[in-house]
Amino acid sequence: MATRVVATATVRAVKGRKLIPTRAALTLTPAAVLRIKTLLQDKPDMVGLKVGVRQRGCNGLSYTLDYASQKDKLDEEVVQDGVKVFIDKKAQLSLLGTEMDFVESKLSSEFVFNNPNIKGTCGCGESFSM
């Protein structure tokens, strides 16, 4: 069950990338795995993060990230390097083939979804269309 928003996320359309079938709908970079582990250290009652999608922004869709205390019945579960990410039923098709990364700079830090299925993004990178 999701409890609250964890972080903001940026979406990037990846052009010219070949889709390579994987077992998981979503793959995590080592930086994303490390950040998720760090976030969950302070939340012993939470078992992972939940990725969802909602109507928002100038391009229509936006990803959401929440803490998850359990896997809901229709969630897809991704387990990688000791962390669990649950994908909400409504977000499953939009995340196929996506890589979840965590990027830090001097001014910001955020999860980034590198999604080859996105047709367009807004200027700020927070919303996308498929």
UniProtKB/Swiss-Prot annotation:
GO biological process, one term: iron-sulfur cluster assembly
Subcellular location: Mitochondrion
Gene Ontology MF, one: 2 iron, 2 sulfur cluster binding
Keyword terms: Iron, Iron-sulfur, Metal-binding, Mitochondrion, Transit peptide
Tissues/organs with expression: Detected in head.
InterPro entries, sorted: Fe-S_cluster_asmbl/transfer, FeS_biogenesis, FeS_cluster_insertion, FeS_cluster_insertion_CS, HesB-like_dom_sf
Feature: transit peptide: 1-24
Pfam families: Fe-S_biosyn
Gene Ontology CC annotation, any one: mitochondrial matrix
Positions annotated to bind Fe cation: 58, 122, 124
Main location per the UniProt record: mitochondrion
Task of the protein: Involved in the assembly of mitochondrial iron-sulfur proteins. Probably involved in the binding of an intermediate of Fe/S cluster assembly. Required for maintenance of circadian rhythms under constant darkness.
Subunit structure: Interacts with cry.
Classification via NCBIfam families: iron-sulfur cluster assembly accessory protein
Family of the protein in this entry: Belongs to the HesB/IscA family.
Protein name: Iron-sulfur cluster assembly 1 homolog, mitochondrial
Lineage summary: Eukaryota, Metazoa, Ecdysozoa, Arthropoda, Hexapoda
Gene: MagR
